[in-house]
C-alpha cells in the first residue's frame, strides 16, 4: 500500500534582509511605538515618515522630495520599504539604486524619467455594458454564400439568455459565433457577452444541471441575478510608463517591417519627449472627463550620491513638472565630492540647490538594547532559536562592529548549533563563528598591520 504525503503548494518566499518589515509601527495618533511592525527605535524618523504617508494619501505631497540621511546600517532602506507597506499595493512604489542610471544604450536622464513615470499611477474607471445569463437557445441562421458555390455562410446568431429576473433573445454578429464555438458554449451554460467589444466569456455550467452526471469536470455556477442587460464598472490600475511602452512599440502590425521587428531582438530604445507629451495630453483629457484619476506614487532612489551633476540638474526640472511623484532619496555619505565634478564638496553628495528643495529625515545609530531587539526579530523571521546569552553576545558584537555583521552571524551560528546537536544557538557557537569570520573593521586593521605583505 503506497502512502504519499501531500506537499503544500503555497509559494515559499526567500527571506530577504528586510522581510520582517511590515509597516511603520505607529499608533492611531501617529506616534511611534518602541517596537512594532518589525521596526525598532528610530521614533522621530518613523513619525516623520508617518506624516509623509498621510500627505501622500491625501495627494498633497506630489513633486516634493524627502532625504533619509544617516550612517550605514541605521534602517534607511527599511523605512522606505515600510512607507511602501503603509501605502498598500494600489499606490505605485518604484525602488531604484543611484548606479542604475548608467547605461550604454540609453541616456542617464532617460532612465530617470522612465522610473519617474513608473512611479505615477493612473486609475481608469470604465463602464461596460454586459449581457449575462444562462443560454436557453443557440441558433445560427445561414444564408446562401454571396461568392457563389454550394457552401452557406452564417448571417447571424440567435441566442436566448435567461436570468432570475427574465429572459432576452439577442441577434448577434457572425464573428461572435466563432467566439462562442471557441468557448464551446452550449445550452445550459452561463456566459457573458461584452456589448462594446463582443468578447464572450463562459463562466461555467448552470447549477440546475448539477445532478445530471455522477462524474463531471464542470464548474457549476448559480443562475445570474438581476437583468440580462447590465452595466458593470471596471477599475484598472496602470502606470504612465506602461502607457509609454505600449505606444512606443505597437504590436501586431501586418506589414513586413512589423513582422521583422517582432522576430529581431528588441533593442532598448528611448521614448521620445514628444510621445510622452502626447500621452500626457490624453491622460489630462481623461482626468478632465472624470474617466481616470491620477495616483502619484513613490520613487525611492537609494545611494543617491552615486548620481552625477547632470542627473541632479535634471531632477530639478523633473520634480517641478506638473506630473511628478513623491521622491525619497537615501544616502549614507557625509561631506563628499559630487560625482561628475572635480572639487565641489557638498553634504550627502547632493548639490546645495537640490538639498534646499528636500525635507531631510535623520536616522540615528541604534543603542545596544535596540540592536538586541532587531537581532531577535531577525532570528524569529528566519525561524532560528537563540538563547538569551547568545543574544546578549550578538548585541555586544553589533555595538562594537555593525548591526549587519551581527545579523549575518545568525545563520552560520545556527548551522554550527545543529552540527553540535543543539536546538538553539548558544554563546559558544557565536564566539566560534565570530572568530572564523572577520568584520570590516578588524579586516581593515589586519590590512593596516600587514600592509607591506600585500600587493600595491
From Swiss-Prot:
Keyword Hydrolase set for record: yes
SUPFAM superfamilies in the cross-refs: P-loop containing nucleoside triphosphate hydrolases
InterPro entries linked: AAA+_ATPase, P-loop_NTPase, RuvB-like, RuvB-like_C, RuvBL1/2_DNA/RNA_bd_dom, TIP49_P-loop
Localization of this protein: Nucleus membrane; Nucleus, Nucleoplasm; Cytoplasm; Membrane
Keyword Lipid biosynthesis: no
Tissues and organs where the protein is expressed, per its UniProt entry: Abundantly expressed in testes and moderately in spleen, thymus, and lung. In mouse seminiferous tubules, is specifically localized in germ cells from late pachytene spermatocytes to round spermatids.
Residues annotated to bind ATP: 70-77
Annotated GO CC locations: centrosome; dynein axonemal particle; Ino80 complex; MLL1 complex; NuA4 histone acetyltransferase complex; nuclear matrix; nuclear membrane; nucleosome
Superkingdom of origin organism: Eukaryota
Single Gene Ontology MF annotation: ADP binding
GO terms (BP aspect): box C/D snoRNP assembly; cell division; chromatin remodeling; DNA recombination; DNA repair; positive regulation of canonical Wnt signaling pathway; positive regulation of DNA repair; positive regulation of DNA-templated transcription
Keywords per UniProt: Acetylation, Activator, ATP-binding, Cell cycle, Cell division, Chromatin regulator, Cytoplasm, Cytoskeleton, DNA damage, DNA recombination, DNA repair, Growth regulation, Helicase, Hydrolase, Isopeptide bond, Membrane, Mitosis, Nucleotide-binding, Nucleus, Transcription, Transcription regulation, Ubl conjugation
Cross-link (Glycyl lysine isopeptide (Lys-Gly) (interchain with G-Cter in SUMO1)): 225
Enzyme Commission number: 3.6.4.12
Catalytic reaction(s) noted: ATP + H2O = ADP + phosphate + H(+)
Positions carrying N6-acetyllysine: 453
Glycyl lysine isopeptide (Lys-Gly) (interchain with G-Cter in SUMO2) crosslink location in chain: 2, 225, 445
Function: Possesses single-stranded DNA-stimulated ATPase and ATP-dependent DNA helicase (3' to 5') activity; hexamerization is thought to be critical for ATP hydrolysis and adjacent subunits in the ring-like structure contribute to the ATPase activity. Component of the NuA4 histone acetyltransferase complex which is involved in transcriptional activation of select genes principally by acetylation of nucleosomal histones H4 and H2A. This modification may both alter nucleosome-DNA interactions and promote interaction of the modified histones with other proteins which positively regulate transcription.
Annotated family: Belongs to the RuvB family.
Subunit structure: Forms homohexameric rings. Can form a dodecamer with RUVBL2 made of two stacked hexameric rings; however, even though RUVBL1 and RUVBL2 are present in equimolar ratio, the oligomeric status of each hexamer is not known. Oligomerization may regulate binding to nucleic acids and conversely, binding to nucleic acids may affect the dodecameric assembly. Interaction of the complex with DHX34 results in conformational changes of the N-terminus of the RUVBL2 subunits, resulting in loss of nucleotide binding ability and ATP hydrolysis of the complex.
Listed name of the protein: RuvB-like 1
Organism: Rattus norvegicus
Lineage: Eukaryota, Metazoa, Chordata, Craniata, Vertebrata
Amino acid at each position: 500500500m503506497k502512502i504519499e504525503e501531500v506537499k503544500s503548494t503555497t509559494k515559499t518566499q526567500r527571506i530577504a534582509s528586510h522581510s520582517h518589515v511590515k509597516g511603520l509601527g505607529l499608533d492611531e495618533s501617529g506616534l511611534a511605538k518602541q517596537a512594532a511592525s518589525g521596526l525598532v527605535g528610530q521614533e522621530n524618523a518613523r513619525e516623520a515618515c508617518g506624516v509623509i504617508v498621510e500627505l501622500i494619501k491625501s495627494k498633497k505631497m506630489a513633486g516634493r522630495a524627502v532625504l533619509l540621511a544617516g550612517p550605514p546600517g541605521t534602517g534607511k532602506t527599511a523605512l522606505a520599504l515600510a512607507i511602501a507597506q503603509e501605502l498598500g499595493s494600489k499606490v505605485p512604489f518604484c525602488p531604484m539604486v543611484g548606479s542604475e542610471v548608467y547605461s550604454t544604450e540609453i541616456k542617464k536622464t532617460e532612465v530617470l524619467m522612465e522610473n519617474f513615470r513608473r512611479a505615477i499611477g493612473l486609475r481608469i474607471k470604465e463602464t461596460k455594458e454586459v449581457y449575462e445569463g444562462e443560454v436557453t437557445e443557440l441558433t445560427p441562421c445561414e444564408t446562401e454564400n454571396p461568392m457563389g458555390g454550394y457552401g452557406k455562410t452564417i448571417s447571424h446568431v440567435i441566442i436566448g439568455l435567461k436570468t432570475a429576473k427574465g429572459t432576452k433573445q439577442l441577434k448577434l454578429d457572425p464573428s461572435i459565433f466563432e467566439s462562442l464555438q471557441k468557448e464551446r458554449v452550449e445550452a445550459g451554460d452561463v456566459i457573458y457577452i461584452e456589448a462594446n467589444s463582443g468578447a464572450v466569456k463562459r463562466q461555467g455550467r448552470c447549477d440546475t444541471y448539477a445532478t445530471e452526471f455522477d462524474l463531471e469536470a464542470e464548474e457549476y455556477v448559480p443562475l445570474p441575478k438581476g437583468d440580462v442587460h447590465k452595466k458593470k464598472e471596471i477599475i484598472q490600475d496602470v502606470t504612465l510608463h506602461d502607457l509609454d511602452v505600449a505606444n512606443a512599440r505597437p504590436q501586431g502590425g501586418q506589414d513586413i517591417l512589423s513582422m521583422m521587428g517582432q522576430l529581431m531582438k528588441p533593442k532598448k530604445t528611448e521614448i521620445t519627449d514628444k510621445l510622452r507629451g502626447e500621452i500626457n495630453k490624453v491622460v489630462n483629457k481623461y482626468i478632465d472627463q472624470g474617466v481616470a484619476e491620477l495616483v502619484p506614487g513613490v520613487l525611492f532612489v537609494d545611494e543617491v550620491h552615486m548620481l552625477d551633476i547632470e542627473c541632479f540638474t535634471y531632477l530639478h526640472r523633473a520634480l517641478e513638472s506638473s506630473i511628478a511623484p513623491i521622491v525619497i532619496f537615501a544616502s549614507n555619505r557625509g561631506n563628499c565630492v559630487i560625482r561628475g565634478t572635480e572639487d565641489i564638496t557638498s553634504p550627502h553628495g547632493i548639490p546645495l540647490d537640490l538639498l534646499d528643495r528636500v525635507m531631510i529625515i535623520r536616522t540615528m545609530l541604534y543603542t545596544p538594547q535596540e540592536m538586541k531587539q532587531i537581532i531577535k526579530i531577525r532570528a524569529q523571521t528566519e525561524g532560528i532559536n537563540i538563547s538569551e546569552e547568545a543574544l546578549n553576545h550578538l548585541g555586544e558584537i553589533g555595538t562594537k562592529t555593525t548591526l549587519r555583521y551581527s545579523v549575518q552571524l545568525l545563520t552560520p551560528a545556527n548551522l554550527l548549533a545543529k552540527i553540535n546537536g543543539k536546538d538553539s544557538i548558544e554563546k559558544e557557537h557565536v564566539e566560534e563563528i565570530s572568530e572564523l569570520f572577520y568584520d570590516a573593521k578588524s579586516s581593515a586593521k589586519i590590512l593596516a598591520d600587514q600592509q607591506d605583505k600585500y600587493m600595491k
